[in-house]
Amino acid sequence: MKQNKKNLPIILASSSPARIELLNRIKIIPSQIIPADIDETPNLRELPAPLAIRLAYEKAIKVASQIEESAIIIAADTVAAVGRRILPKATTYEEVKNCIKMVSGRRHRVYTGLCIIKKENDQLTVRQKIVQTIVKFKKLSDEEINFYCSLDEGIDKAGGCKISGYAEAFISFISGSYSNVMGLPLFETVNALTSLGFKVYNR
C-alpha cells in the first residue's frame, strides 16, 4: 500500500503578525519564522509591481540559502502605490499622515509579490506571483486624518494603512483580494503550495 508522503515543513520568511495570522486562517502553522533582512530600497525608476516581486524573491532566496534542511519557504512583500508613485512603509507620524492624504478620496493599488521556494535535496523549485488589489478611500477630513494618525496603526505598514484596523471604515471600494492587502494573498498561496506538492487540505 502506497503511503502518503509527508508535507515538508513551512518556513515563513517574515515576522509580520498579519502574515502569520493569514496562514493560521488556512490552518498552516510555520515550523519556523525566519525574517529575511534585505535592503528594500527601490531601484531607480523601479515600478511598484516589479519591486514587490523582486523583494519577495530576494527574501525567499536568502532564507533558502540559510537553511540546510528540506522545507518550503514562503516570502512576500507588499507595496502600495498611487499611479507609479510608491508609497513608503511609514515609520513616523508624518509619513503616515502624508500617505493617508495621498490616498484620500482616490483609488490606489496594493501589490503583493509572493515567492514560494521548495528546497529539497538541495534542489530549488520556485513559484512566483504578483497580485494586485484596487482600494478606494472616501474623501477624508483633516479631523479623520489626524485621528487615524494618532492611533499609530499605520506605522510599518505599506502606504501607512492597516486595512484590518480602523482604516477599514474609510474604504468605499475594493476590487481584488482582501488578504492581499493584508500582506499575503491566500488564494494564490494555496495554489502555489499545491503545485509544489504540499497537501493543503489532506494533512
Swiss-Prot record:
EC nos: 3.6.1.9
Record-annotated active site: 77 (proton acceptor)
Coiled-coil segments: none
Known cofactor(s): a divalent metal cation
Any one cellular-component term (Gene Ontology): cytoplasm
Keywords: Cytoplasm, Hydrolase, Nucleotide metabolism
Annotated family: Belongs to the Maf family.
Predominant place of localization: cytoplasm
Descriptive protein name: Nucleoside triphosphate pyrophosphatase
Enzyme class, broadest EC rank: hydrolase
CDD domains the UniProt entry points to: Maf
Gene Ontology MF: a single term: nucleoside triphosphate diphosphatase activity
GO BP terms: nucleotide metabolic process
Gene3D superfamilies, per the entry: 3.90.950.10
Lineage: Bacteria, Pseudomonadati, Pseudomonadota, Alphaproteobacteria, Rickettsiales
Function statement: Nucleoside triphosphate pyrophosphatase. May have a dual role in cell division arrest and in preventing the incorporation of modified nucleotides into cellular nucleic acids.
Compartment annotation: Cytoplasm
PANTHER family, sorted: BIFUNCTIONAL DTTP/UTP PYROPHOSPHATASE/METHYLTRANSFERASE PROTEIN-RELATED, BIFUNCTIONAL DTTP_UTP PYROPHOSPHATASE_METHYLTRANSFERASE PROTEIN-RELATED
Catalytic activity line of the entry: a ribonucleoside 5'-triphosphate + H2O = a ribonucleoside 5'-phosphate + diphosphate + H(+); a 2'-deoxyribonucleoside 5'-triphosphate + H2O = a 2'-deoxyribonucleoside 5'-phosphate + diphosphate + H(+)
